[in-house]
Design a protein with these regions (language model features):
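Mixed-charge, low-complexity intrinsically disordered regions
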Residues: 1-2, 6-8
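Mixed-charge (Asp/Glu-Lys/Arg
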Residues: 3, 13-14, 18-59, 64-74, ...
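Conserved tryptophan-centered aromatic signature that marks the ligand-binding surface of SH3
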Residues: 89
């Protein structure tokens, strides 16, 4: 079973649209060309370089490694994880449609895949720390390599509600580097919520 991480914008600004539309989008800015037009990942990389003279080859390689799978590797039936930047939860969906390109869509929603969101608002606390590191990968789109453990945690949440993670050690995480800042901020926020309530928390936010 293949599982993908797909973010809803750098700051989670498209999260509600992803959920409400029942879709995931490849939200690369001004990428108004069908991904299936490129015969290889290298062709996509070359396109990024040619479109902007200031784009370095390594940067284009990074972008292509994320964008290419959306149009050419993801498949119907595979699972997508959407980490929320609004709340400390993760949404999970199953891909139900092939890659679609709409040249008339508003930027950056040219590229989409339909999704059945079968598990919304699964608390981060349901997952072991190494899995959370996977969800914190510093990439917009990448593979998640702990599929079985993730699915097991989702099923446990759906059947019994939040429970303590197993604490099993594992070395595989994801195809991307970890967004340490995002994970640290999430941990700090959770600690504050546990320690401070009501108006005291409001004063801290102010």
């Amino acid at each position: 079973m293949t599982m993908w991480l797909c973010r809803a914008g750098r700051f989670g600004e498209y999260e509600n649209k992803f959920i409400e539309d029942g879709c995931i989008y490849c939200t690369w800015d001004n990428l108004d060309v069908a991904l299936t037009n490129f015969k290889s990942r290298q062709d996509l990389q070359d396109y990024f370089v040619s479109k902007n003279d200031e784009t370095k080859v390594k940067t284009a390689m990074n972008w292509a490694s994320q964008v290419w799978p959306f149009g050419n590797e993801m498949a119907v039936g595979e699972i997508v994880a959407l980490p929320s930047k609004i709340n400390s939860v993760i949404h999970f969906g199953r891909i139900t449609g092939e890659y679609e390109f709409n040249a008339d869509a508003p930027n950056p929603f040219y590229h989409r895949r339909s999704i059945d969101w079968f598990a919304l608002n699964v608390p981060r606390s349901c997952f072991d720390q190494d899995i959370l590191y996977s969800f914190g990968a510093f990439m917009t789109i990448c593979r998640i390599k702990q599929e079985k453990r993730v699915v097991k945690a989702i099923e446990a949440f759906q059947n019994h509600g939040p429970s303590a993670p197993s604490g099993d050690d594992a070395h595989e995480s994801s195809d991307g580097a970890i967004d340490i800042e995002a994970e640290a901020l999430s941990a700090i926020a959770q600690r504050m919520i546990q320690k401070v309530k009501g108006h005291d928390l409001a004063r801290i936010v102010d």
